[in-house]
A protein has these predicted regions:
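Residues immediately within or flanking Cys/His clusters that coordinate Zn2+
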Residues: 27, 31
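Conserved small/polar residues in nucleotide/adenosyl-binding loops
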Residues: 152-159
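A short beta-strand-turn-helix
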Residues: 13-15
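Radical SAM/AdoMet-radical enzyme domain recognition
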Residues: 76-144
Length: 163
């Protein structure tokens, strides 16, 4: 059983897959406490893999994004295999502190200050920039970097981002 906050259909709004239709499976719970997080971590219902798949197949997208909270606390190879069996391309959005199953198709790591990244393979790094030193993330084993800038933070502090 896995604690699910919500399952919904939308377009991927950021990163490498921006604009692609996707089914989002938002897991509850996280091992980090970020002030800017938009997930209600305690909300959700316990669902089996079969119940998750039953909801996912109601939507037309071939891409599934496992997000959170922290999906690494919940996902396993059997869930990813079940999604693959339904013809789904499986993406995970993670803070990188949990080892992920090896059968995930795309890994987006959004590292957080104070969290040790434990991933050997990362397709994309997404850094939520709120004024921190992002150079510490440039050595992560990633193919792509995506840095959404917090406009309100930049305005408030008149800061510019230099990489």
């Amino acid at each position: 059983m896995k604690k699910i906050n919500e399952i919904f259909y939308s377009l991927q709004g950021e990163g490498y897959h921006t604009g692609i239709p996707a089914i989002f499976v938002r897991f509850s719970g996280c091992n980090m406490k970020c002030s800017f997080c938009d997930t209600l971590h305690e909300d959700g219902i316990m669902m089996s893999d079969e119940e998750i798949i039953s909801e996912v197949v109601k939507y037309p997208a071939s891409m599934v994004v496992l997000t959170g909270g922290e999906p690494g606390l919940w996902i396993d190879e059997s869930l990813v295999d079940a999604l693959h069996n339904e013809g789904k391309y499986v993406c995970v959005e993670t803070n990188g502190t949990c080892v992920l199953p090896g059968n995930v198709d795309w890994v987006t790591c959004s590292p957080k200050e104070g969290g040790e990244v434990r991933l050997n393979h990362i397709d994309e790094v997404k850094i939520v920039y709120v004024g921190q030193d992002v150079s510490v993330y440039l050595d992560l084993p990633a193919r792509y970097y995506f840095i959404p800038v917090s406009y309100t933070h930049l305005r408030a502090h008149e800061t510019s981002l230099h990489l």
